[in-house]
A protein has these predicted regions:
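A short helix->loop->beta-strand "cap" motif at the edges of active sites that frequently abuts
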Residues: 49-51, 128-129
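Structural recognition of alpha->loop->beta junctions
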Residues: 71, 110-112
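Active-site neighborhood of phospho(di)ester-bond hydrolases with catalytic His/Asp-centered motifs
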Residues: 6-7, 30-36, 52-57, 92-94, ...
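Binuclear metal-dependent phosphoesterase catalytic core
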Residues: 25, 77-86, 108-109, 125-127, ...
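N-terminal active-site segment of His-dependent metallophosphoesterases
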Residues: 1-45, 49, 66-74, 78, ...
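Pre-active-site segment of Zn-dependent metallo-hydrolases
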Residues: 11-25, 92-107
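Active-site environment of divalent metal-dependent phosphoester hydrolases
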Residues: 10-15, 38-41, 59-64, 97-102, ...
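Helix-adjacent hinge/juxtasegments
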Residues: 52-95
């Protein structure tokens, strides 16, 4: 399965629309957002995807985000999200909680550790986990998202045009 990975969208609606179009065109139907959504109105852009979200340090109104996420059928948004795809365990969190990151990697429980926060693309192995940061769609020199193929383990960095 191809899993689309986004983070740090910071309410940049036009760029997020372009990113989601690119993911859709690449055959992605499942996405995760690693935090800093910032506005509940962003969530409606993800309609048509199976989507999971986590809160970032910029998601000040977590109550409104959760209310909208539930209304749209995505479910609750917490500090982290753990799930499994094709036998691979995945944890998603924003990345500003460094002890949580270290614990996730040190535990050896996760095939994939997905985070955001730094606005920089990352794809590396730490212990037994692959760490993926898709970059950002706001506040970065280049706007990027990622696609993880859970069957092959391939991670693709996708550049999203600003305009």
């Amino acid at each position: 399965m191809k899993l689309g990975i986004l983070s740090d969208t910071h309410n940049n609606i036009d760029v997020v629309r372009r990113a989601l179009d690119l993911l859709r065109d690449s055959g992605v139907s499942h996405v995760v957002h690693a935090g800093d959504i910032t506005s509940p109105k962003m969530l409606s852009l993800f309609t048509g995807f199976t989507a999971r979200f986590v809160l970032g340090n910029g998601d000040i109104d977590s109550e409104a985000l959760n209310e909208e996420s539930r209304r749209l059928g995505f479910g609750p948004i917490g500090e982290s999200c753990v799930f499994e795809e094709e036998g691979k365990s995945i944890i998603v969190f924003h990345g500003n909680n460094v002890p949580m990151f270290r614990e996730a990697v040190a535990s050896g429980k996760y095939h994939y550790v997905i985070k955001g926060h730094t606005h920089l693309f990352e794809n590396y192995t730490a212990g037994t986990s692959r760490v993926i940061n898709p970059g950002a769609l706001y506040g970065a020199d280049e706007f990027t998202v990622a696609i993880l193929d859970t069957e092959t383990g391939k991670v693709e960095r996708i550049l999203v045009e600003a305009e």
